[in-house]
Amino acid sequence: MRRKATVDRRKLSEIIRRIVKVAAPEKIILFGSAVRGEMGPNSDVDLLVVKGGKYNRSRLSGDIYINLHGVGQAVDVILVTPEEVERYRNTHCLVIKPALRDGKEVYRV
C-alpha cells in the first residue's frame, strides 16, 4: 500500500509560525495537494490566510513571503479578508470555495 504524500508537520508548523508572526491572521486553511495527500517533489503548500482589518494586501503578502524565505518548502499564500470569504464562498472560479470545502483549518485565533 502506498503512503499518501503530505507536507512535513514540522515544516508546516514553522510556516504557520512565520505567517502568524508577520500577519497575525484570524485563520489559516491548508488546501490543495497537501490535504489530498498528493504532494510531489515539485508541489507547493497552499494556504488561505484570513485576516481582517485594514492593511495593504500587497505589502503584507510581500512581508509574509520574505519571512518564509529559507523555510525549505515552496508556499503559495492567498491572503483574504473574512468579508471576502463570506462574499465568495460559493463562487466557482475562485480558490476560496475549494479551500473551504476541502481544506483543513491549521490555525485559528
Where are these regions (language model features)?
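Short, conserved active-site loops that position catalytic residues or coordinate cofactors/metal ions
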Residues: 43-45
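Short hydrophobic/aromatic beta-strand micro-patches
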Residues: 48-50
